[in-house]
Design a protein with these regions (language model features):
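Alpha-helical transmembrane segments and immediately membrane-proximal extracytoplasmic
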Residues: 1-319
């Protein structure tokens, strides 16, 4: 009688405990996390492009248009309404939430993060918000790993590993770069670099990248070609570039925190919408290539041949910062 009262999930868990070893099951879960995370990344990109194409289909998206004064405000309003009335939780700072889950919540991430970040970021970016899709999809992937592990009653150390698998799969799936996903997880989330953790991370990253390749083709997100072979004499310039980028990253982080502090003092959400939306709309109206993700601008930089193109890209980079 007891056996009959067990749910299907409980029977699966009991069967797994009796027939599949813990380490083997972790590898199976990491494979599943890679698949689910890859499809989540594909869905996010699909929604962003569909919204963006629908809104900009009737005019040249690279030229100034008065609709650019409207779209970002509408996008921020819709995303804010969605978060306040549907999600009813703070979903900002995706990577920070993952680190908090690892350090304070034993790898447990709320279920709504599986879909809430994807929908909110798709609306924001599709309507022109100059933000990246990386942090939302990393949070989504980590939430997939955490909740999949929770379903099968895995211990907290395994949950933290699956959180890392989701993050690795997210980066690998959206960029088609499994090594980038692995390095991101090891460096940013600081998952233990042991053989027992490295193999699941690799499986998730490679699986996600493979699914992305199968569904969208082998074309890389950033397309470029090298006209000349790399020479050792260029190493000092590469080092200087790394130092400069590090300083820019530091400035960007502190500037973002300062702006958040200013907006945090505004208790009225409509004031935040008005100030933030208007500033973003004006910038996009003046500099249309700021609309959306910005990957087209990066490709322009990688393949640009004229001085005018380079000037445009550099000016846009300064505006982004």
């Amino acid at each position: 009688m007891k056996e009959e009262k067990l749910s299907l999930l409980q029977r699966c868990i009991k069967w797994r405990e009796n027939n599949i070893k813990e380490k083997q099951f972790i590898l199976i879960l990491s494979f599943l996390v890679g698949i689910f995370t890859a499809f989540a990344a594909l869905l996010l990109k699909f929604f962003i492009h569909q919204i963006q194409n629908f809104l900009t289909d009737n005019f040249n998206a690279t030229e100034a248009n008065y609709l650019y004064l409207v779209y970002p405000v509408v996008g921020i309003f819709l995303a804010g309404w969605f978060v306040r009335n549907i999600v009813k939780d703070d979903i900002s700072h995706g990577v920070t939430k993952i680190l908090y889950a690892i350090s304070r919540r034993q790898g447990r991430i709320k279920r709504h993060n599986i879909w809430s970040s994807t929908i909110a970021s798709a609306i924001t970016i599709g309507f022109g918000g100059s933000v990246g899709a990386e942090a939302p999809i990393v949070l989504t992937g980590s939430a997939i790993g955490s909740n999949l592990g929770s379903v099968f009653k895995m211990e907290h150390r395994t949950l933290m590993l699956l959180v890392g698998c989701g993050a690795a799969g997210a980066i690998a799936g959206i960029f088609k770069a499994p090594i980038a996903g692995l390095v991101f997880t090891l460096e940013v989330l600081m998952i233990d670099l042991t053989m027992s953790s490295l193999l699941p991370l690799l499986i998730s990253a490679v699986t996600a990248a493979t699914v992305s390749y199968i569904t969208t083709g082998t074309e890389a997100m950033f397309k470029f070609h090298l006209d000349q072979a790399f020479e050792l004499e260029r190493i000092p310039f590469v080092i200087l570039l790394g130092i400069f980028c590090g300083l820019i990253s530091l400035y960007f982080t502190r500037a973002m925190n300062s702006v958040e502090g200013v907006f945090g003092k505004l208790n009225n959400p409509y004031k935040k919408l008005a100030f933030g939306g208007v500033m973003l709309s004006v910038l996009i109206f003046l500099f249309p290539p700021l609309y959306g993700e910005g990957y087209d601008t990066i490709n322009l930089l990688l393949n640009g041949t004229s001085a005018a193109e380079w000037d445009t890209v550099m000016n846009l980079s300064l505006i982004h910062i």
